[in-house]
Amino acid sequence: MGQSKDLRRSLLGAAAFSVLMSLQPAYAQSAGNNARVEVSIEAAALGDSLRAFSAQSGIPVIFSEKQVDGKSAAAIRGTFTPLAAVERLIEGTGLRVVEGQGGTFVLREAGASGQPSTRAGDTTAEPARVAVSRAPEQLPELRADTVVVTGTSLRGLAPESSPVETFSRAEILGSGVTSTEQFIRILPQNFGGGSTEFTSRGLPDDSNSQRNFAFGSGANLRGLGAGATLTLLNGARLAPASTIGDFVDVSMIPVNAIDRIEVLGDGASSVYGGDAVAGVVNIILRDDFDGAETSLRFGSVTQGALEEVQASQSLGRSWQGGNLLGTYEYFNRGSLRLADRPDIQPPTLLNGGAAGVTEFLDLLPAQERQSLVLSGRQQLGDRLSLSSTAFYSDRNVSTFGVGIANTITLGPSRAQSKNAAVTFLADYELSARTVLSFEAGYSENHSESFSQVQFPAVAAPVRDATDSSLWSASLIANTELFTLPGGPIRAALGGQFRREELINRPFGRPVLRNGERDVSAAFAELHLPLVSADLAVPGVRRLELNLSGRVDEYSDFGSTANPKIGVLWEPVNALRLRASYGTSFAPPKLGLSGALDLGGGVLRYDFIRSILNIPLPDPSLAGVNYLITSGTANDLEPETSQTFTAGFDFDHVAGRHDLTLKGSFYDIRYEDRLGITPVPGNLNANFAPGFAFQDPSLFPEGTVVFFPSQAEIDAVLASFERPLIFAGGATSATNIGFINNVALTRNLATTETRGIDAQIAYGMDADVGRLTARLDASYILDFTNQASPTTPVVDSINTLYNPVDLKLRGQLGLSRGNLASNLVFNYIDDYATSSAPTAVPIRSWSTVDLILSYEFRNARTRWLENTQIGLSVTNIFDRDPPPVPTQTSFALTGYDPANSSPLGRFAAISLRKSF
């Protein structure tokens, strides 16, 4: 109760402080638009390039879609004044730029009359919401991009002390993908395991992924699980998917509605609160299109029957001070059957045999999705700006798979997911330096799944429904405090309230999961420019300090405070060194803290040993049955983490050549992480009894209980909230030789991972066109789990269904006139089924993709104008995924869905037309 009062006082104090800040005198002049900015923008359509400039610099550029229609911009990289950067982008387009109030830029026709450009530094560099009516001249159909910056509450300012990768709309659509999930999956920093549509039954070492009954897909940075990556839509949270609510289903977000995706490879609980342990994926929607755009795409595998159809329609209208945009997308994909991939081994059933009817077994489910996004913005007077976004998506999935205990053939599964969200944002300029922002939102996710008989004990189809919802409201004040030698101190102060609910109801059975949570928070952030280039300090061209902190109070887990500090040092022009340290806090997901899912099964030990080739630990265990438990333990604790990052960024432009180098090191210590108990050698849970019999110290006490008494057996069975299952020849809970609790979800002692991300990009304007080359690499140095402080550390890296140490993605591009081509090389290093001496090697996997596009500009035929056609071929050489042993309990076939794909060669053609 005392903590609640303290937090309320903090929130009231935050509100009072924001009002006082609005009344303070201006202590010094703003740095203005003469401060140099670092930009790295690929050659693209002029509108996309200007939006990329706004995203990277935090400075809005006001223009109409008609002004930039059919115009392109050359690539620019390096350090520029904002005005010089925009002038480089519009060079040769017949446009010119003038500076408006509020630190904005306004594009005009080169021959238009008007006031000359003001001298750089004469205007305030406040890149907040733009009052279009205060621009020097009134032009029709003007609008300003909303600058959403990931990893900060500061408006229009992107602290450079943390590693952030921005992927533009042109990069996303030009990568050959058809869905948001596909684009997230190809990022080197993302691990393909966890909750995805490729693993409907989950993965052995990720208990959360086993609750993904609706075939959703979540971002999984650093391989720490989808629940450790915070996924945002326009900077706001979404209601989570799965029966435990541990991830946002990115496959529900239409790719044609996206403006850009920003990936923060750093902890961010000091800004966003819980869940931002491994990083943040912020999907920012398009909100400023003027006109109409139609997109069609058809694709197919070259071996098999899978086909894919995508169609979208965008309609937008911009006017002075506002805009409205709607995007509809339809997506339909057939299933990929195991029969189409004869080199992939079918799964092994619990009776020891292989699934025999493989012509119906799906490696990838069929799905049909419809999505709609609406967004609007309106300026009301000089000070108030209102905006809103609404999102709805409906997906149906169907597949044939193997039930967990099926001993005969296959069963159909169907699932439906519905996701809806609406946000409202109001910005009010209290003064020239202070902006007050209020944001409110609601999001919900509903999913239902239907499966044919999965267990012999169940005589009817299994039906399951999950509903999750999220309400939130926040109030943030942004202001300038006073001026340091390097420039003005920027500050953000705010409070937030959030309510989360989740309920999981299997039809005809008791509720499995039921949880609700209220979260109140107060947070603050400071940007301190200690040294700027104007001071001419030797060896310190720029030095900045970023401080942020957040206090969250959870209705079910108390309060937590998480700080973060970041430092940026620019010793010379174009070279920036950065480092950050912060802490994070994540309460158990609602579906875990409110879980009623304890259950288990009885199997014959000789049967499971024969399938997995497990040696008999002791003659006393011959012929016994064993009881294995699963589900969620009681008395779960919150997860906490400490994250350290360090890196550099280097950009250099010399004539027609430009070079970018980036490197980042990360070190994450994840304590009390929820998961199943790791087994030495990263082996299956069924190997644990053999290890425990020889050396009990390998596991926490009570993990494996040998020769339990009848009272101990009865106590375990009495705690079950699900029906007991019998398999492998066992018919009763008698002759129990041991109880195996390895598969029970509980708090582990620690998970630690360290790694390096690197990027090198080169571009040249040659006689043949614009040449580009880029290589992205992710190298994991360590990835270890420890069940308790007294048990050995288990190394999970380079083992089956877990992260592989080295991932590469290389690109070679050529743009000449209206034609653009890109050749992509993907590589995943070799690894093994486990770290045990008897492990089976798994070869490396490399694929090559080709993406071609042609845009009709200044076409003689009017209907071809502003039309783009494209061809993409992924996995040109039709490389099969590396073969791996099948996995019994999870109905996994003979490939690793976490590190490869069964799709094979896939070709697609696309058509995009703007009106």
Residue ranges and their predicted role:
Residues F105, F183, L187, S217-N220, ...:
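N-terminal periplasmic accessory domains that precede
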Residues D287, Q303-S443:
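Transmembrane beta-barrel wall of Gram-negative outer-membrane proteins
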